[in-house]
């Protein structure tokens, strides 16, 4: 396998968003807030030139070149997060025992009761910057919102994972909380 001498990718920064890069510590500021990400573990060169960011790899192998697109996607998701935000919608699915959900601490802690008729209360603490609300338009739906895609999606995964059915046939017992829709809070025209 050969090595590429030089490989780069360019990301354009939209209006109203400022990006600051210091020693691969990226800070993105926008109308919805501020996000920070440490990219020191990714061995690439980041340069901010005007309203663009350039990702550069010198003498990179195939895996090293793949880091360009990873860093590109991370920063692009941060830009989308501070301009539009991220929203996950999850549906409560049950056959017999209705699942009860309570939100505490301003929608940052989710309590799940009566899952498969069990007496225990399952408690999930959401990651920082993530809020959970119960949908008023659709029955048995919760909405998870935040600016960081990583935190919103990980909080949704934690809620889904705590409701795994164990020691039963999962083809028959479909009860749980599942992601039904993913998108942005503010859609751009």
From Swiss-Prot:
One of its GO terms (biological process) is cytoplasmic translation. It is found in: Cytoplasm; Nucleus; Nucleus, Nucleolus. Its main location: cytoplasm. GO terms for cellular component: cytosol; cytosolic large ribosomal subunit; nucleolus; nucleus. Keywords: Cytoplasm, Nucleus, Ribonucleoprotein, Ribosomal protein. It comes from the Eukaryota. Pfam families: Ribosomal_L6. InterPro entries: Ribosomal_uL6-like (IPR000702), Ribosomal_uL6-like_a/b-dom_sf (IPR036789), Ribosomal_uL6_a/b-dom (IPR020040), Ribosomal_uL6_CS2 (IPR002359). GO terms for molecular function: rRNA binding; structural constituent of ribosome. Component of the ribosome, a large ribonucleoprotein complex responsible for the synthesis of proteins in the cell. The small ribosomal subunit (SSU) binds messenger RNAs (mRNAs) and translates the encoded message by selecting cognate aminoacyl-transfer RNA (tRNA) molecules. The large subunit (LSU) contains the ribosomal catalytic site termed the peptidyl transferase center (PTC), which catalyzes the formation of peptide bonds, thereby polymerizing the amino acids delivered by tRNAs into a polypeptide chain. Component of the large ribosomal subunit (LSU). Mature yeast ribosomes consist of a small (40S) and a large (60S) subunit. The 40S small subunit contains 1 molecule of ribosomal RNA (18S rRNA) and at least 33 different proteins. The large 60S subunit contains 3 rRNA molecules (25S, 5.8S and 5S rRNA) and at least 46 different proteins. Belongs to the universal ribosomal protein uL6 family. PANTHER family: 60S RIBOSOMAL PROTEIN L9, 60S/50S RIBOSOMAL PROTEIN L6/L9. There are 2 genes for uL6 in S.pombe. This is Large ribosomal subunit protein uL6B.
């Amino acid at each position: 396998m050969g090595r590429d001498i030089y490989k780069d990718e360019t990301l354009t920064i939209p209006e109203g968003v400022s990006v600051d890069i210091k020693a691969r510590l990226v800070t993105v500021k926008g109308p919805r807030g501020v996000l920070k990400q440490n990219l020191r573990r990714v061995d690439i060169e980041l340069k901010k030139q005007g309203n663009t960011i350039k990702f550069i790899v010198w003498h990179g192998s195939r895996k090293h070149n793949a880091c360009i697109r990873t860093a590109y996607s991370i920063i692009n998701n941060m830009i989308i997060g501070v301009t539009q935000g991220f929203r996950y919608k999850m549906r409560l699915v049950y056959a017999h025992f209705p699942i009860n959900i309570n939100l505490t601490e301003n929608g940052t802690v989710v309590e799940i009761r009566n899952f498969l008729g069990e007496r225990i209360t399952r408690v999930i603490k959401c990651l920082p910057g993530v809020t959970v609300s119960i949908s008023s338009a659709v029955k048995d739906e919760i909405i998870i919102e935040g600016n960081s895609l990583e935190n919103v999606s990980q909080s949704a995964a934690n809620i889904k994972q705590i409701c795994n059915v164990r020691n039963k046939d999962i083809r028959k017992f479909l009860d749980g909380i599942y992601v039904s829709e993913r998108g942005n809070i503010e859609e751009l025209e």
